[in-house]
């Protein structure tokens, strides 16, 4: 578990996969209390006589269980379906409608931005993934009353920060580190522009709340 704690402090983790064992249950309980919104998948060669262990996994609110040797072919899909990215995508499902992203290019860009939040997406990199020029992407993304691309990039990253901060185990300094903000003040300024709140209020908003706050009046840069 020490290695897992170090990873959580250093990188954006989308889900935790571990092999439950009776000796780990106490530490797993502490982990779950710190990270109640983090998907945790139990993956082990469970046997018929492991009923008590599986019941303890349920008590510790593991997201799902998979049986090693039986579910091997689908474990990747199981993890993706319960990952933070998938949960965040569902929370932001109304984003295209609320932000007037009606064109195919706008929606394709949105899908990539919701997924790739660990680092600030460069417009050129996004354009390359979409196989268009940087200029075309910047011009077309903001068409039809949609927000400009830079603000939507910030929106998706602030939504992820809000998702992480729903967990008591994530401090603001940790979120700054794992999402590669330059500093705590950089995060605070971005959060203020996008959601008009302090970072300490993000956990209460969650990703959906960030989207709603943004759509209510923060879609355009202030002069």
Language model segments and positions:
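Acidic, metal-coordinating helix/loop segments flanking the phosphotransfer/catalytic sites
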Residues: 1-15
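A short, hydrophobic beta-strand element within the central beta-sheet of small alpha/beta folds
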Residues: 17, 37-49
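Short amphipathic alpha-helix used as the core "switch/output" element in two-component signaling
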Residues: 25-37
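Alpha4 helix (beta4-alpha4-beta5 surface) of REC/receiver domains from two-component response regulators
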Residues: 46-65
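Receiver (REC) domain switch/output surface
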Residues: 53-56, 69-88
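A short, Lys/Arg-enriched amphipathic alpha-helix from helix-turn-helix/homeodomain DNA-binding modules
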Residues: 95-120, 129, 152-170
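Basic/polar phosphate-binding segments, predominantly the helix-turn-helix DNA-binding elements
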Residues: 123-152, 178-198
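Terminal helix-turn-helix DNA-binding modules in bacterial transcription factors
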Residues: 124, 143-182, 205-223
């Amino acid at each position: 578990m020490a290695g897992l704690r170090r990873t959580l402090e250093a990188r954006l983790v989308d889900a935790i996969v571990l092999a439950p064992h009776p000796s780990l249950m106490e530490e797993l309980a502490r982990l779950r209390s710190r990270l109640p919104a983090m998907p945790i998948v139990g993956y082990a060669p469970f046997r018929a006589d492991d009923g008590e262990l599986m019941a303890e996994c349920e008590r510790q609110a593991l997201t799902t269980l998979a049986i090693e040797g039986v579910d091997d072919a689908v474990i990747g899909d199981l993890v993706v379906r319960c990952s933070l990215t998938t949960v965040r995508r569902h929370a932001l499902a109304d984003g295209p409608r609320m932000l007037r992203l009606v064109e195919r290019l706008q929606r394709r860009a949105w899908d990539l931005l919701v997924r790739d939040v660990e680092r600030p997406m460069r417009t050129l990199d996004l354009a390359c993934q979409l196989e268009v020029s940087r200029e075309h992407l910047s011009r077309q993304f903001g068409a039809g009353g949609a927000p400009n691309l830079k603000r939507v990039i910030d929106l998706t990253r602030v939504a992820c920060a809000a998702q992480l901060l729903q967990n008591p185990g994530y401090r603001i300094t940790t979120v700054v580190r794992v999402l590669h903000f330059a500093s705590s003040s950089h995060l605070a300024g971005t959060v203020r522009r996008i959601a008009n709140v302090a970072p300490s209020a993000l956990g209460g908003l969650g990703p959906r709340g960030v989207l709603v706050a943004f759509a209510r009046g923060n879609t355009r840069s202030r002069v």
